[in-house]
Amino acid sequence: MNKPPVTTALLDRGRDRFGIFCSPCHGAGGDGNGIIVQRGMPRPTSYHDERLRTADDQHFFDVISNGYGAMYSHAARVPPRDRWAIVAYIRALQLSRHASIDDVPPEQRAKLSEAR
């Protein structure tokens, strides 16, 4: 399956699937501080590390599909479209952490200022 376009629906699905399949290890914010770490398992790499922020989308899809290190394959549990949804959500997490106000369109900046 080719990578689908990123839509709100895809991001919503990605957030849901991330919460089920990824956050127990990677944590809700993708920092690598999921519940498994609290139980003594090794900490997975943070999605906010430079190496993963600069990795291409296919890397994340492949890791979900095939596993990596201590992470097992999720291919039997997560269909391809959901894998792409998770990838899109990981990118949203990364952007949310590393964005500046200049990345926000001017009309949205005004709304953010009003909300404060």
Q: In which residue ranges do the predicted regions lie?
A:
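Long, soluble amphipathic alpha-helical coiled-coil "stalk/rod" segments that act as peripheral stators
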Residues: F60-V63
